[in-house]
């Protein structure tokens, strides 16, 4: 097993420098270390003076503290006029036991010079003390239970020695500077450091994706006026469109949709297919190279062979020497119940998406009847307000989903904290995924496909006509929905994420100024930490979840929103410093967690990558007009059968893609404005003009769409698999370093064995040439 922290790491190893992160090759900063001789507290418990006057609560406090004392902890009560602070510090015997159980000193420095006393890193001290404090007492209570009952008000680890991080990292002016990952690790632990290392690498890799998306978007401008389809739409003054919904009671000239059609072609063009394949490859390369970066980082930290189960068992034994191992268990009954309950929650998410559909239908009718918008603006107003309603629904469902996921985890009874965290991650992300993407699925694949035809429209509750896509397709609706939701999440969430803790901290500081200041520096330090915003086990989890949802928006449906990587890039540059400022300046110190990877989040990223291939393939096949344009170009248009006419190959596409409806077949009793001299109108579909049944061309297109989807997904997935195979997860330098360490360990054991009594005396040293000849 590898050591806890590395104090002397050789310089010059391959990959010591990473984009947006900085790996130190020297010893950790001394301000991050605490020796046993120091009088700094590892942890602080806070109680209100009123609990001291309550005999029963004071007795429970004393019982808890005395039990800590029996486990080898020291405590000291420090009072001010309102609060009582209990400083907690572990005895050196606790850390000696920790080293003994893991059979390793604290880092390579201790192994090279075992006689030199090595300081215990503050991250290790806090982690061990936090584990013991939050374990069950002899009475069956946890510290969380005591806090809920008001026996203690709160608990936290102290900020000490964070000045360097404030200067080098937690400032807005450092936005484009590299991150001091080693310093972050020495102060916040490996879990937080890996989060920022991953976030920095993700942000760096967004640069090529953002550039490619911007190129695709700008290339659409070349088609803004030059597109044959746009020209036909803008010049079609003699083609009348059938009313598209209850909000429209008049015939509209096709040329009136000119601007909307041009905007649609910014996103729905031939470059979309190439960009979708590029993003599938990008997602794979991003993950594969991150695995290599992670391997270098954890080897640098001497955690390559660290075992999480062994660590947790060691902490359990430190807390209770009589601890009995909890074996792995699996209950099919519990799993079945959890699966059923999860499916019910997913059905609820889908139900909310249906409610959003109802809202869009009713909003269209209301906006038209109330004359709030002009008729041509109603559709845009419905899309925008629908996206806003969906965003509010996401905020509400996030709280509900977290509560449900926690209850499901409690019911499942995981064996350890890490197992509980992993199961909670899967459940919560699944629910959040459906909450965020259900409406996008509706717009991309359902909107406008179940409406019937003008003479026999499908109606909600028999009253309101379902909304339809624009003549140019649903890509613009999908783009607007994604842009609004992602834009709101990135801007409003970042503002709330910073302003909320900042305002809360300022309010706490203002209230504290009403009380007399203490002259005791120790008490002032405790008060300063107490006035910071509280943290919990979800503090880092929420940051990861936010980035996973953003990654989903950046890859899933990116064919409809090529600017998503660019928006994510700018957002992440702000997010890194925002999180740094929040953790160092505005919040209490996070409890350090040891880790050698980002855990279940890696599987989440891989799942999103596969879903992105499927979703983008379906968007190109069924949502965009790419397939109908290609089929017309080579099967129905002027260029069919290899002809090379003087006109554009898409000439006549608009007239070909619109079906004819005779106005005499309208069943709607409401009089349509200007219908006296109109005998026919056109609508977006492939139907027969005689009986309005689906035409042969519809089925041909459907077959080609399905074939394209299968080919696209297979090609994209093959590219992903080849890229994953071509780029090894672990660099050769890391493999060789690990191999060398194993070899040196065996040589050391061999040397030690030769010195032991009973070895059998000196043996002849084999000829090196003979050793090599045996290979």
Language model segments and positions:
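Intrinsically disordered cytosolic tails
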Residues: 2-775
């Amino acid at each position: 097993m590898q050591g806890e922290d590395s104090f002397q790491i050789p310089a010059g190893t391959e990959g010591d420098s990473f984009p947006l992160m900085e790996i130190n090759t020297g010893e950790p900063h001394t301000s991050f270390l605490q020796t046993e001789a120091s009088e700094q507290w590892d942890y602080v418990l806070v109680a209100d003076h009123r609990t001291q006057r309550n005999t029963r609560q004071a007795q429970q406090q004393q019982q808890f503290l005395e039990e800590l004392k029996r486990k080898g902890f020291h405590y000291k009560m420090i009072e001010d006029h309102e609060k009582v602070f209990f400083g907690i510090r572990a005895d050196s015997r606790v850390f000696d036991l920790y080293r003994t159980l893991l059979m390793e000193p604290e880092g390579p420095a201790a192994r090279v010079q075992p006689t030199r006393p090595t300081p215990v890193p503050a991250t290790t001290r806090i982690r061990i003390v936090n584990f013991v404090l939050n374990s069950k007492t002899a009475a069956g209570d946890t510290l969380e239970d005591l806090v809920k009952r008001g026996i203690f008000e709160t608990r936290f680890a102290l900020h000490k020695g964070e000045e360097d991080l404030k200067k080098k990292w937690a400032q807005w002016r450092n936005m484009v500077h590299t991150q001091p990952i080693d310093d972050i690790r020495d102060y916040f632990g490996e879990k937080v450091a890996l989060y920022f290392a991953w976030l920095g690498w993700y942000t760096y890799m967004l640069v090529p994706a953002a550039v490619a998306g911007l190129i695709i978007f700008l290339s659409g401008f070349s088609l803004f006026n030059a597109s044959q389809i746009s020209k036909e739409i803008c010049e079609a003054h003699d083609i009348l469109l059938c009313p598209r919904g209850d909000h429209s009671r008049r015939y509209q000239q096709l040329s009136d949709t000119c601007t909307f059609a041009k905007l649609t072609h910014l996103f729905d063009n031939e470059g979309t297919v190439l960009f979708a394949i590029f993003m599938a490859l990008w997602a794979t390369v991003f993950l594969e190279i991150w695995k290599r970066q992670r391997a270098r980082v954890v080897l640098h930290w001497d955690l390559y062979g660290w075992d999480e189960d062994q660590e947790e068992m060691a902490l359990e034994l430190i807390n209770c020497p009589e601890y009995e191992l909890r074996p792995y268990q699996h209950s099919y009954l519990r799993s079945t119940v959890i699966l059923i309950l999860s499916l019910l929650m997913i059905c609820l998410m889908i139900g909310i998406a249906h409610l959003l559909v109802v809202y869009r239908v009713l909003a269209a009718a209301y906006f038209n009847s109330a004359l709030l918008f002009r008729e041509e603006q109603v559709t845009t107003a419905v899309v925008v307000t629908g996206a806003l309603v969906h965003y509010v629904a996401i905020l509400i469902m996030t709280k509900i989903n977290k509560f449900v996921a926690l209850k499901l985890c409690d019911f499942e009874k995981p064996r350890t904290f890490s197992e509980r965290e992993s199961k909670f991650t899967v459940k919560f992300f699944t629910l959040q995924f459906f909450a965020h993407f259900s409406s996008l699925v509706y717009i991309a694949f359902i909107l406008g496909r179940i409406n019937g035809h003008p003479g026999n429209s499908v109606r909600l509750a028999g009253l309101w006509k379902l909304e339809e896509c624009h003549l140019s397709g649903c890509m613009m609706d999908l783009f607007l929905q994604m842009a609004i939701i992602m834009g709101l999440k990135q801007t409003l969430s970042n503002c709330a994420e910073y302003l909320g803790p900042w305002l809360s901290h300022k309010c706490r500081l203002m209230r504290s100024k009403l009380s007399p200041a203490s002259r005791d520096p120790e008490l002032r330090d405790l008060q300063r930490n107490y006035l910071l915003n509280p943290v919990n086990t979800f503090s880092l989890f929420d940051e990861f979840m936010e980035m996973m949802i953003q990654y989903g928006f950046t890859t899933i449906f990116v064919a409809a929103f090529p600017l998503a990587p660019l928006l994510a890039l700018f957002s992440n540059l702000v997010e890194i410093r925002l999180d740094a400022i929040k953790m160092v300046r505005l919040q209490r110190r996070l409890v350090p967690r040891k880790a050698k990877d980002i855990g279940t989040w890696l599987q989440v990223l891989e799942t999103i990558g596969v879903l992105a291939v499927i979703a983008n393939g379906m968007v190109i096949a069924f949502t965009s007009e790419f397939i109908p344009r290609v089929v017309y170009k080579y099967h129905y248009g002027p260029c069919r059968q290899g002809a090379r006419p003087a006109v554009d190959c898409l000439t006549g596409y608009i007239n070909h893609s619109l079906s004819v409806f005779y106005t005499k077949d309208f069943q709607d009793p409401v009089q349509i404005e200007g219908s006296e001299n109109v005998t026919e109108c056109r609508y977006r579909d492939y139907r027969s003009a005689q009986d309005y049944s689906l035409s042969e061309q519809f089925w041909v297109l459907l077959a080609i769409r399905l074939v394209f989807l299968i080919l696209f997904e297979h090609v994209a997935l093959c590219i992903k698999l080849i890229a994953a195979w071509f780029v090894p997860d672990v660099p050769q330098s890391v493999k060789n370093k690990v191999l060398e360490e194993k070899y040196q360990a065996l040589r050391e054991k061999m040397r030690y064995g030769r010195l032991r009594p009973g070895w059998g005396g000196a043996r002849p040293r084999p000829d090196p040439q003979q050793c090599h000849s045996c290979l």
